[in-house]
């Protein structure tokens, strides 16, 4: 087994120095990965990025812009998957340059690791359903980019050690682990907040994916449901549990979003929620 160097990992978790252009790292706040589920077009994606950058600068929250350039895991064959890989990646590159903010996006197969990295993506995200795919983890690791591994809905937090080791063995200690809920029956997820300290034992930053944790998957309609009215509750509990970072998908009008609208945070609610979460963080 690969032995994770927790001294290196803990130092990185504390400073997050391996994420280029990450601001406000000395604020003592949690860091935030947030944005739309998928790049829908340049105008709306820029609007979301600009809005969150203004909020996080005001609140001094370290911020990474999040958007998938392509959605490979959709329920139905005719579900929206993207506007085109290169077009979407170009938009992410423009956002990084325009707002001087790091960006994170998902990859789904080996060639996509180098493709996304070539557009300057700072964090390569491994989707939960792919978190055990050794070749994919190794391909992401070999780019030298930070790798955010989402915990599969079917995995224990302890088992995520082995996913992290697959990246570390490639000489890349830039790892993050994300809790995104555990399957509860066929069509529901629950969050076991014990996962946060259990995964922090490995020494890497642990993120709570707030919005995906509220999904209601496997609906007979072929459209994933969600309970966005619980976003605030799950986010508050996550901060109270000591999570290092939060992941939230957001949109100006979730009802018109092209993917995952049922569990998104409405963009105009973002600042108020983050303000409340900072207050919780300050009393820990």
Regions found by a protein language model. Name each.
Residues 14-32, 284:
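N-terminal amphipathic alpha-helix/helix-capping segment at the start of soluble metabolic enzymes
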Residues 32-34, 63-67, 103-105, 124-126, ...:
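Hydrophobic faces of well-ordered beta-strands that scaffold small-molecule active sites
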Residues 36-45, 63-85, 250-261:
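Glycine-rich, proline-tolerant flexible connector loops at the mouths of alpha/beta enzymes
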Residues 37-50, 150-161, 180-198, 216-235:
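Active-site glycine- and acidic-residue-rich loops that bind
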Residues 52, 80-103, 140-146, 197-206, ...:
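Alpha-helix-loop-beta-strand connector modules within alpha/beta enzyme cores
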Residues 67-125, 132-136:
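N-terminal active-site wall of soluble small-molecule enzyme domains
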Residues 75, 129-198:
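Conserved anion-binding
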Residues 115-125, 139-147, 168-174, 202-205, ...:
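Glycine-enriched alpha-helix->loop->beta-strand junction motifs that scaffold or abut catalytic
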């Amino acid at each position: 087994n690969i032995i994770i160097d927790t001294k290196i990992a803990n130092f990185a978790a504390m400073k997050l120095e391996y994420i280029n252009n990450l601001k406000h790292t000395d604020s003592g706040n949690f860091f935030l990965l947030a944005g739309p589920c998928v790049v829908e077009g340049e105008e709306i994606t820029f609007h979301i990025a600009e809005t969150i950058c203004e909020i996080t600068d005001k609140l001094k929250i370290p911020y990474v812009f999040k958007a998938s350039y392509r959605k490979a895991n959709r329920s139905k064959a005719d579900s929206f998957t993207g506007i085109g890989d290169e077009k979407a990646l170009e938009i992410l590159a423009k956002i990084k340059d325009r707002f001087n903010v790091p960006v994170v996006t998902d990859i789904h197969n080996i060639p996509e690791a180098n493709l996304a990295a070539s557009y300057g993506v700072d964090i390569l995200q491994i989707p939960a359903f792919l978190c055990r795919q050794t070749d994919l983890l190794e391909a992401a690791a070999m780019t030298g980019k930070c790798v955010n591994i989402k915990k599969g809905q079917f995995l224990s937090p302890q088992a995520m050690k082995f996913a992290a080791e697959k990246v570390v063995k490639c000489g890349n200690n830039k790892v993050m682990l994300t809790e995104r809920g555990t399957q509860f029956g066929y069509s529901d997820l629950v969050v076991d907040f014990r996962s946060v300290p259990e995964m922090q034992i490995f020494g890497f930053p642990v993120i709570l994916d707030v919005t995906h944790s509220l999904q209601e998957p496997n609906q007979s309609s072929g459209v994933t449901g969600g309970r966005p009215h619980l976003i605030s509750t799950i986010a508050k509990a996550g901060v109270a549990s000591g999570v290092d970072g939060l992941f939230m998908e957001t949109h100006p009008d979730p009802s018109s979003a092209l993917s995952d609208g049922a569990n998104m945070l409405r963009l105009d609610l973002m600042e108020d929620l983050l303000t409340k979460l900072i207050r919780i963080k300050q009393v820990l």
